[in-house]
Amino acid sequence: MGSSFGDLFRISTFGESHGGGVGVIVEGCPPRLELDLDEIQAELNRRKPGQSHITTPRKEADQVEILSGLLDGKTTLGTPIAMLVRNKDQRPGDYSDMAVAFRPSHADATYQSKYGIQARSGGGRASARETIGRVAAGAIAKQLLRKAAGTEILAWVKQIHTIEAHGIDPSTVSMNDIEANIVRCPEASVANQMIERIEAIGREGDSCGGVIECVVRQPAVGLGMPVFDKLEADLAKAVMSLPATKGFEIGSGFSGTLLKGSEHNDAFIPGDDGRLHTATNNSGGIQGGISNGEPIVIRVGFKPTATIRKEQQTIDSDGNATTLAAKGRHDPCVLPRAVPMVEAMVALTLADHLLRQQGQCSLW
């Protein structure tokens, strides 16, 4: 329970951080889609640990194995696609202290309370390694959306701790801009400040959080359904299911609460393509829970990494007060590696809604 996502384009992830491997089963992908397997691996490379000095030093190749669902290794059959990444660089001994003391603000205590047992080594299903399956499946969803509607999905780091980038234009930012530095902030001068802040906080044995922004350019019109299956509601659920997420905004977000209706409303204007367009995009590309064809713009807040080397007050499994200074290899800031995770969850949501839209509204 709780390890599957989606309705028609549905994924189920499996595996633990220090188990044999992690992976995903993708169901509902349409047949005859020619997949670029290098693109799937490239997305996993963006997510994998050890890619820079501001991420966890754990070394994993994260090489994907596709076990089923493809003809000649590239063409989807319409049957379940199973993908596996084997764990290689495990150090269970780093978690000996955590076997008896709960990490503050981590899932240790709540998993123990719920199940009466937990995978203490590496955090089990609460580890960010669970997201490998999401990113691999999201890479397939990205290719489906691009072929079906010309949709492009890009995310980047907008804020680290108190340092925020203000000069990024969602309509023009490119993948090259985002990947130009290790923090994945397209505003170069701000990126350098972010890197220095992560380094400084990491040296203290501490961690920091921030905000990732994501844009969907050329989304299909009509995605989403009234009331309980609104597109923004499903996007919020998707990205808020990622580890360490604590906040979600779309369009103007909370700043829109400071405007009057006359200031916030997106005036409709005719477009050269024969479609309705809006003069502004405070709605973030979604109105009434349904995509209007304008860029979808969301922001996701991530808390500081819970596992830190700094000594903290906690309790042990018997309820006694103790302290914990975590060992192991952990990200001082999750955001640089979370960028492809956000893109993946957005892609999976849109792919699912695209199939639902086609199934309901394209019969005649």
Curated annotation (Swiss-Prot):
Biological processes per GO annotation: amino acid biosynthetic process; aromatic amino acid family biosynthetic process; chorismate biosynthetic process
- Identify the GO cellular component terms for this protein: cytosol
At which positions is FMN bound? Answer: 125-127, 288, 303-307, 329
- UniProt-listed Enzyme Commission number(s): 4.2.3.5
- Broadest EC class? lyase
Report if keyword Flavoprotein is assigned. yes
Q: Which UniProt keywords are listed?
A: Amino-acid biosynthesis, Aromatic amino acid biosynthesis, FAD, Flavoprotein, FMN, Lyase, NADP
Which ranges does the record mark as transmembrane? none
**What cofactor does its activity depend on?**
FMNH2
State the pathway, as annotated in the record.
Answer: Metabolic intermediate biosynthesis; chorismate biosynthesis; chorismate from D-erythrose 4-phosphate and phosphoenolpyruvate: step 7/7
Reactions listed under catalytic activity: 5-O-(1-carboxyvinyl)-3-phosphoshikimate = chorismate + phosphate
Q: Which Pfam families match?
A: Chorismate_synt (PF01264)
| GO molecular function terms listed in the Swiss-Prot or TrEMBL record | chorismate synthase activity; FMN binding
Tell me, how does this one assemble? Homotetramer.
Q: Which family does it belong to?
A: Belongs to the chorismate synthase family.
Listed name of the protein: Chorismate synthase
Species name for this entry?
Synechococcus sp. (strain CC9902)
Q: Gene name on record?
A: aroC
